[in-house]
């Protein structure tokens, strides 16, 4: 052994760790601030659209044409969104265009303003990944900045939802299913917690629900129902992922011109969104989530209609994420299943909220942690069991088609 050589190696490792920690801290602050702006504007837009749905929804086709023009005029590659992020994380792509950040924010705001059914979390993840990857390349971090890219994804997720534990594991497990990027754990944790604290300090509120009931896993009937629910939630997430991929392919083949695709198809989309209880299925789906956890009115078909409208909205070129609609789909389905089975509907809604998301994104630890961060740890074992079953039956499908699979 050479003590001086070992000491040099230790110093090099300490310097590298310090640079990652400092970078993650700075990126967490920046991404958390952007998340706060993006999230607060989106909430304002949601309230404004809800109050003026009759006036705004007829302009959905024109809004779609505007989104296509923005991407084609400024950076068409950026329209690939999460696919670019995944490819960069897997080393298949050298860079992510910085234009993605303003384009995806503007496109998502426009989509929601005029009534499209879409989410927001995927947008935040793209923002975090793009900014962190550009930072890593600018300062010549190793491995094409992959570690900081994962940290940025965690910051984007954690900053918008303020579920930092779940955000860390989502970023670590989503790029390559079945393989955890443990080398990114420390930077991802620092970036995620910093972004969460920053966005909260800037006025973005966390969604959380205190469940008053706890499921007993010692009761055979309850366990049987939970296994059945896990299967149904897993199949629902799988259905969403498969339909999203197939409908995108179909629309691209039938209407190759993006202007015609979004212009023509969004006309009947707007009509049906309006006929669906005056825009009940527009936007994020937070209205359905609120109904599920306040004991409000939910219909047996809410989950499937929200699923179909979201798939169609995203398949023709509108912008926005998938995660919040997945939460609303799962919560709506879980509430109905719980009511039918005689189990606490709100607890079952929470299980659906997490498990459908986990199935559709082909992740396991992230949805379990979301359940405990949003709804409390009291039903932690139930979240674990249901999310595990959903993960196992989803058939390795994922809404992010560029996700790599290391097993199955």
Language-model segments: what does each one mean?
Residues 1-408:
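Alpha-helical transmembrane segments and immediately membrane-proximal extracytoplasmic
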